[in-house]
């Protein structure tokens, strides 16, 4: 394997959504391969046909591509090592299974599910770790079952599975790239089923065969696969193959340090996409769940190119990584602040078009969906929003007439003489040919000074009639962005609609 081109893989099962842990596994495999000028592959492990979900394979790959994780080889992209779907490789597994049977490293097992459960319960009562009792281990492999009985069952067509024969009293050892040396005692290892009665291989068997034939140099996967390592290493030994290097990633934890699960929050990537998180923020966040650049670095915002340049397995920790949604939200905010205006404009158009389809705005649709207008809204609001969709939902007054006016603000700010004051100020604005924030501010201050009023007396009601709410960006800049025609119309509308609160 020395000198071989680095090849990594992400091998999900098409059983539903992409878990955030799966995204991290895919990302680390991708980053490592690209950092080493190698190849990243997607393989679909669908050997458990009972759990297969329609379109899950396509959705998994499209989610990865949305995140910027593009495979060099996959079921959709093809490649020199296909097929890349395990259910299309059954003849390959049968061939290697027969080799194990011929070499007496595997054997037929005809035990029924009832027998297996009875044996399991008996071992539990005895305080033993449940393991197969080797009832069908042949005499010539150290067992007690005559070959004649095995042949009889095969001739009768009795359903069977094929189990690996785990050697007795041996030590299975390997060097994990992240965790260092790890050793297992074969006495704790069950005779794993390799081929099921439906003719499909188990995960353990198929993954080892495929990882070897597809020439992967590094297997980067979750910590939960560590207990399977001795079975996999024994299979490599049975076939006389050199195993790849293994790196087992730390668990993802809830803030209370329990294992991340959907019982305590969202765990599917699509859940966070639906909430409005961008691919850049999600990838950045997931990259930091276990990896850090090293001592002395305070950088927390990384582009994909920067991650590829800086990533190394040596900087991945062993301890569980806490999934802190607040950190993800903070990262999203950083990307909103720095993302090019034209990119944000394109991002909010679908949200705006959906909102427009549900409402009939009084202003011209062409105007409020123009790139120039949207760019002005983005410039003014980017410091105040957390997600792209909030440019529309949080700032709807840039696109729609206020449907109501904040009651508390009306009660607090609306004086009996406010219709008269706003009407008078509206005439000054109408005569203003230079409708800029600076001029509007100067106009307002000049208007209130002779009346002995503070600017706030007009500022708050003016914001209210224009936006319907008592908060938002700089009033003067908001008025400039909305434009004179809209501002004058909304002042008149507000004067007509807002009633003087009763004492």
Swiss-Prot record:
Motif 'KMSKS' region, chain ranges: 259-263
Gene3D superfamilies for the chain: 1.10.10.350, HUPs (3.40.50.620)
Top EC class, one word: ligase
Keyword set includes Nucleus: no
Keyword Nucleotide-binding on entry: yes
Residues annotated as binding ATP: 262
EC number: 6.1.1.17
Family annotation (Pfam families): Anticodon_2 (PF19269), tRNA-synt_1c (PF00749)
Main location: cytoplasm
Biological processes, Gene Ontology terms: glutamyl-tRNA aminoacylation
InterPro entries for the chain: aa-tRNA-synth_I_cd-bd, aa-tRNA-synth_I_codon-bd_sub2, aa-tRNA-synth_I_CS, aa_tRNA-synth_I_cd-bd_sf, Glu-tRNA-ligase_bac/mito, Glu/Gln-tRNA-synth, Glu/Gln-tRNA-synth_Ib_cat-dom, GluQ/Sye
Subcellular location: Cytoplasm
GO molecular function: ATP binding; glutamate-tRNA ligase activity; tRNA binding; zinc ion binding
Listed GO CC annotations: cytoplasm
Keyword set, alphabetical order: Aminoacyl-tRNA synthetase, ATP-binding, Cytoplasm, Ligase, Nucleotide-binding, Protein biosynthesis
Top-level lineage group: Bacteria
Span of the annotated motif 'HIGH' region: 12-22
Catalyzed reactions: tRNA(Glu) + L-glutamate + ATP = L-glutamyl-tRNA(Glu) + AMP + diphosphate
Cross-referenced SUPFAM superfamilies: An anticodon-binding domain of class I aminoacyl-tRNA synthetases (SSF48163), Nucleotidylyl transferase (SSF52374)
Record note on quaternary structure: Monomer.
Job of this protein: Catalyzes the attachment of glutamate to tRNA(Glu) in a two-step reaction: glutamate is first activated by ATP to form Glu-AMP and then transferred to the acceptor end of tRNA(Glu).
Annotated family: Belongs to the class-I aminoacyl-tRNA synthetase family. Glutamate--tRNA ligase type 1 subfamily.
Protein name: Glutamate--tRNA ligase
UniProt source species: Chlorobaculum parvum (strain DSM 263 / NCIMB 8327) (Chlorobium vibrioforme subsp. thiosulfatophilum)
